[in-house]
Amino acid sequence: MKIDYLHIRSGFKNVQDLEIDFDNRQLLTVLIGRNGSGKSNVIEALVRIFRALDLGDEPAPFSYKLSYSLGSSSDRRIEVDASPEYGSTPIQQHKIQVSTLGESGQYSLPESISLSKVTRDKEGNSDYLPKHLFAYYSGPSDRLEDLFKPH
């Protein structure tokens, strides 16, 4: 998986209206900033986003837009536009579109899919989520551990 774009629109902790357009030519991204600037909160926000997509029964944690690619050659692009304001159920709150990379090197027109199609099946498989999500926090805190427990 490669995250291409993240826009946290509504406030998540101290992160407000933050846009990150990740360099799609690099596989590594480094977040650098002063203490208290929100680096760890960005990582936690991503964990909360993928947790909601993975479980499928949680409301959108905040308003955001996320674009990421899956596959060894980034052959699928998934775009998620989510907000608690879009409706009262998790399915209404998540607008998801998928594009497929064609032989010409161009992505197809996006196809809308439901959150229920993204969520993992009983065997833990999903065509629209990464197989693994890893996060590391180097502080004396279990803030991320609690988010991973249901998985």
Show which residues each predicted segment covers.
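P-loop NTPase switch/coupling surface
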Residues: 1-151
